[in-house]
């Protein structure tokens, strides 16, 4: 043995065999927490980005099949119904069979986990949410990928703490929140919104400390870097770059916010009604649940052919609306139609979120409001597109009750940084009116409903997790 080998052996003899594990698992070490937060953010970025690509692949493949092989064998409408029904069936089956907590957006589950009242079975949630979401969103249903990405990001955070055997409760909590922030940052290419979503919307559950906030920031940054490395650095929504509106028009944004505040409260209540209605239909019976979901998927396959504006998450619809190709009456009809389709899809328990559908609704009503104001007040030089962007943030703020997140989210998604003042006015107006009307934030409402109506599952899951 050489002298160098003896020195190396002597050094290694004093190093614990699981040195890395011990270093990272010491929850009291701030540096180790930040390292794990970077790992969580990176993994959440990959999961969120490839989830988006997977959904896009399924949608494109479905379209190609309709144009070629299947479309030439069966009538086009029948082929569209069958393909979308099959995709929806896959999503509903995976959820009901393997991970019921993966139904819906999943954000209430993460909030419940941060309060230690819901488990995180990441080994089930990650594959079910990923592949189930591919099926449900790929079928053309009005669902967003943002909620699922937040839940999968949180699941990644819990996975990392389990892999490194982290015992410290505060560290586990911080990394769970970090994963949620990373998931949203990757879903919207919006790191600031991802950070603020955890700090603002999850404020009842989030344990504020310097290390936890730093962990959330690092995770969001890493997730966004991964997203941009794969998808590029362009904004998620390509829209015109608007200038700040005239000061004499700002009162219109306050009025728009008030209208969204009223609608946000009504919309949240309608979501609960829709969920309860679907439960009354299928009564948690798997066959009824799958049949209902498949029929719903087939209907949206048909709508994809004839009224595509009423299908999908709505991100692609937003820039189309701001081109000015739709009349005010058509915008109102599309708004009403998408309210109905959003309630049907999200209320059914499909593995999909409601972020993107809400942004589309805000755009439709906001643009219709701006176009109407332009007709009624021609001397004010009103740009309807500015009201469309303000509407995106206002409906989010009214329903989620997170105005700062809504402002940052819209700005980052559209790159319209000059519109921060009208966004602030509209979002704050929406939140104030919603609070005055006594409405609950949507995710708190959904979590409360889950805890109330699903107590048996809540008691069983920790046993399954422990096993």
From Swiss-Prot:
Record carries keyword Cell membrane: yes
Name under which the protein is recorded: H(+)/Cl(-) exchange transporter ClcA
Subunit structure: Homodimer.
Membrane topology (Periplasmic): 68-74, 231-250, 308-327, 375-384
Source organism (scientific name): Vibrio parahaemolyticus serotype O3:K6 (strain RIMD 2210633)
Chain segments annotated as transmembrane: 31-67, 75-98, 122-139, 146-164, 213-230, 251-279, 286-307, 328-347, 353-374, 420-436
Catalytic activity: 2 chloride(in) + H(+)(out) = 2 chloride(out) + H(+)(in)
GO cellular component: plasma membrane
Domain of life, source organism: Bacteria
InterPro entries: Cl-channel_ClcA (IPR023861), Cl-channel_core (IPR014743), ClC (IPR001807)
Coiled coil regions, renumbered to chain: none
Site annotation Mediates proton transfer from the protein to the inner aqueous phase: residues: 201
Taxonomic lineage: Bacteria, Pseudomonadati, Pseudomonadota, Gammaproteobacteria, Vibrionales
Gene label: clcA
Reported function: Proton-coupled chloride transporter. Functions as antiport system and exchanges two chloride ions for 1 proton. Probably acts as an electrical shunt for an outwardly-directed proton pump that is linked to amino acid decarboxylation, as part of the extreme acid resistance (XAR) response.
Topological domain ranges for the Cytoplasmic compartment: 1-30, 115-121, 165-174, 200-212, 280-285, 437-467
Residues at which chloride binds: 105, 354-355, 443
């Amino acid at each position: 043995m050489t002298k160098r080998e003896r020195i190396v052996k002597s050094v290694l003899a004093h190093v614990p065999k699981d040195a890395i594990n011990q270093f990272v698992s010491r929850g009291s070490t701030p540096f180790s927490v930040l390292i794990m937060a970077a790992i969580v953010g990176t993994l959440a970025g990959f999961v969120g980005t490839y989830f988006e690509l997977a959904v896009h692949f399924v949608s494109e493949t479905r379209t190609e099949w309709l144009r070629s092989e299947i479309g030439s064998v069966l009538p086009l409408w029948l082929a569209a119904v069958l393909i979308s029904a099959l995709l929806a069936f896959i999503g509903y089956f995976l959820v009901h069979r393997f991970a019921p907590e993966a139904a819906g957006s999943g954000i209430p589950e993460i909030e419940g986990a941060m309060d230690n009242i819901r488990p995180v079975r990441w080994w089930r949630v990650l594959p079910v949410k990923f592949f189930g979401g591919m099926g449900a969103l790929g079928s053309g249903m009005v669902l967003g990928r943002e909620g699922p990405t937040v839940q999968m990001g949180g699941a990644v955070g819990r996975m990392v703490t389990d892999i490194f055997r982290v015992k410290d409760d505060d560290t586990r909590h911080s990394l769970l929140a970090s994963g949620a922030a990373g998931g949203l940052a990757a879903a919207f290419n919006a790191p600031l919104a991802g950070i603020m979503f955890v700090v603002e919307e999850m404020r009842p559950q989030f344990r504020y400390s310097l290390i936890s906030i730093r962990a959330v920031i690092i995770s969001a940054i890493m997730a966004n870097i991964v997203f941009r490395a794969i998808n590029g650095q362009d904004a998620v929504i390509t829209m015109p770059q608007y200038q700040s509106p005239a000061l004499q028009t700002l009162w219109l944004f306050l009025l728009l916010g008030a209208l969204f505040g009223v609608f946000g409260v009504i919309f949240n209540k309608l979501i609960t009604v829709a969920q309860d209605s679907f439960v009354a239909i299928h009564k948690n019976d798997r066959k009824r649940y799958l049949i209902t979901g498949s029929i719903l998927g087939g209907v949206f396959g048909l709508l994809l052919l004839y009224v595509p504006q009423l299908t999908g998450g709505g991100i692609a619809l937003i820039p189309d609306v701001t081109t000015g190709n739709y009349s005010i009456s058509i915008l109102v009809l599309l708004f009403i139609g998408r309210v109905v389709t959003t309630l049907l899809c999200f209320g059914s328990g499909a593995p999909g979120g409601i972020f993107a559908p809400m942004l589309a609704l805000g755009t439709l009503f906001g643009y219709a409001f701006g176009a109407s104001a332009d007709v009624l007040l021609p001397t004010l030089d009103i740009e309807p597109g500015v009201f469309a962007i303000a509407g995106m943030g206002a409906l989010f703020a009214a329903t989620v009750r997170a105005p700062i997140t809504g402002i940052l989210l819209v700005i980052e998604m559209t790159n319209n940084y000059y519109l921060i003042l009208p966004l602030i006015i509209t979002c704050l107006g929406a939140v104030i009116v919603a609070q005055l009307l006594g409405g609950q934030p949507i995710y708190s409402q959904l979590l409360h409903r889950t805890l109330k109506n699903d107590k048996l599952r809540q008691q069983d899951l920790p046993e399954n997790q422990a096993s």
